[in-house]
């Protein structure tokens, strides 16, 4: 990953962590940690690695909650990075 990609990935990770901690009210997404963000070369797709504190049995409900909140999260990332086209967010456990 190039330096600009790395910088944007770090910013996305920080923004998503803050959003999940403070602004998302879905109880399925409590105690979810963003562990890494990887961008493709064109910065159109972001693969976000997440983990939930607690047990692995929450994986399905956490992924369902993230899928439901994906539009909100992408819009907020776009606003906070001040870019027109935020990368598409793909969450992985």
Across the structure, where does each feature detected by a protein language model lie?
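Charge-rich, low-complexity N-terminal segments
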Residues: 1-46, 51-93
């Amino acid at each position: 990953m190039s330096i600009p990609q790395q910088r944007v990935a770090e910013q996305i990770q920080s923004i998503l962590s803050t959003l999940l901690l403070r602004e998302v009210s879905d109880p399925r997404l409590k105690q979810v940690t963003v562990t890494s963000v990887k961008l493709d070369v064109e910065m159109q797709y972001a693969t976000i690695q997440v983990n939930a504190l607690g047990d692995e049995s929450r994986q399905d409900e956490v992924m369902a909650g993230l899928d439901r909140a994906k539009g909100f999260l992408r819009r907020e990332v776009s606003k906070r990075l001040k870019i027109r086209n935020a990368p598409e967010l793909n969450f992985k456990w």
